[in-house]
Amino acid sequence: MFRKTDTNEQLDIFSSPSTYMKGRAAKKYEDPHAWHNEFYQYVTSKIDEETFRPLFKEGNMGAPNASIRILVAMSILKEGFGCSDEDLFEKCEFDLLARKALGMGTLEDAAPSIDTYYLFRRRICDYEKEKCVNLMEKCFGQVTGEQVKVFKISGRSVRMDSKQIGSNIAWYSRYEIVHATLRKEMNEFTLPSLNPSLRKKVEEALTEDAQKTVYRTDSDTMAVRFQELGQLIYSILVRLKWDETHLLHRVFHEQYNVEHGKAIAKDKKDIKASSVQNPNDPDAGYRSKNGKKNKGYNTNLTETTDEEDKPSLIVGVQVESATAADNSFVEDAIKKAEEVTGNKVTTLYSDGAYQSPSNRKFAETEQIKFVANGIQGKRSRFDLTDLLSKHQVLDRNTGELIDAVLTKGGKWKVKLSEGKTRLRYFAQEVIDRFLTRMQIEATPLEERNKRNNVEASIFQYCFHTRNNKTRYRGLLKTKLFSYCRCMWMNMRRIQLFEITMCQRA
């Protein structure tokens, strides 16, 4: 049965740690601007436990057996310190500052058990799988919304940036991906369902060390082995009649085609970036950005721009597979920011990756000033400023003005005096892109650089990652990490802001 935490507990002065502390220690422990007191004031005490009511069935006595507020705050504290679960529970038991931050102000308060903590996080993930609603995201929005109200942050101007972040998985070759999936799916429950001859082949395949096979085998032999492994898996799928709900079925059809009952390996170029990169994390995608390869996820952060005498807070967090383009986040990010702040966004600062025709149309429809510090693609050789008015194009290389003619297909055509390709065509899309670039370049540099501040948020977001990898596997766990990490970042910003304001005073 759902049960709220009692917020009106009677405090025993003899159980408070500060009673046994001397001057300096007691002063620091009770300092309202110390991180532990700021955390309790602006995070722990702001958590609305009603958000998590759906996780607990009515009539189920004994559940939850710990404060939901403390369980959520523990997750935030963990990502704030970047510590392991073991270190987290050690802090909850013996670190007086961490206990104070969680609301355990007396020595008699007991920390939740590790089983309760894990069960709570698993329930959040299971609920999202079933209902497609992330309760930790709702909690993030609710807590941040409370902070926005306290500091009267308008949120009318926001900036956003994204970060490719890796999943905690090994990098596998195609052969290793298929072999590891076979090993994962074939167990004591599925093997008995195979006929004796097929079972023997599978058992032989499972004894192989795929990593050593790839390392020791030449490419031609490897291609043959990859083909044979695919044929074996095809026989398993036919025998067990497995459909797309099974991971082995998905991996097989991502890596092979079937022609006349035979498994034919797909060409490397035909493998999609959204295909399984490692069976231990089927949600992770592949992307190469600015020469850096990533197998994992793409996180987008939206934050308020600096307002005078007000902190800048993260008001939106989105996590998708690494294949998600930056410009796909914009509309949803704006809507979430408006829900948190309660105000309409009027100005958006971003980089060129967020530019797209649909986003520009969205900004125009919603009357949002879209300020980007660039646009993807190199600068055109041709200046199209006078194309529509004077029907002329300026060749920047030669300085020549060239007359343009409108074709029946709706494109503008110009004829060059030299070069292999004398005719050039300009569609409306190209013209719109040119005008957008000109508009961006005309924006004052100071205005465009407002977006750069969000890069500090990106740095802090992945501060505790190793080799740009989180500790987690799976989209749902990566989401939990992201929401908790950003709630911690907001708390630290508030703390630094209040310290700065006190120093000014």
What is each stretch, according to the model?
Residues 30-73:
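Basic, short loop/linker segments at the boundary and entry of helix-turn-helix/winged-helix-like folds
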Residues 44, 65-69, 80, 93, ...:
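Generic, well-ordered alpha-helical segments
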Residues 57-58, 103-105:
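Short linear capping/connector segments at secondary-structure termini
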Residues 61-65, 79, 288, 478:
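Short, solvent-exposed segments of well-ordered alpha helices
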Residues 70, 96-101:
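General structural concept
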Residues 72-82:
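Alpha-helical support elements that line or immediately flank enzyme active sites
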Residues 84-87, 92, 106, 110, ...:
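Anion-binding and metal-coordination hotspots
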